[in-house]
Amino acid sequence: MKQTDIPIWERYTLTIEEASKYFRIGENKLRRLAEENKNANWLIMNGNRIQIKRKQFEKIIDTLDAI
């Protein structure tokens, strides 16, 4: 890890790949959730790249029994 790298658990946003590892949810499932919830407050589109707001997505997951 480079000195300028921010640990994944401190990042504000995560890529689909990072979120998949962090939340232990498949990449395809996360892409599908993003596609189905385009206006969700936990989602940011950076061009065509999906970014997930970590803390807000954690709150969503806390309320769910299953994904």
From Swiss-Prot:
GO annotation, biological process: DNA integration; DNA recombination; provirus excision
Disulfide bonds: none
Sequence intervals crossing the membrane: none
UniProt key word DNA repair: no
Domain of life: Bacteria
Cross-referenced InterPro entries: Tn1545/Tn916_Xis, Tn916-Xis
One Pfam family matching this protein: Tn916-Xis
Keywords, in A-Z order: DNA integration, DNA recombination, Transposable element, Viral genome excision
Stated name of the protein: Excisionase from transposon Tn916
Organism whose genome encodes this protein: Streptococcus agalactiae serotype V (strain ATCC BAA-611 / 2603 V/R)
Taxon lineage: Bacteria, Bacillati, Bacillota, Bacilli, Lactobacillales
Gene name for this UniProt entry: xis
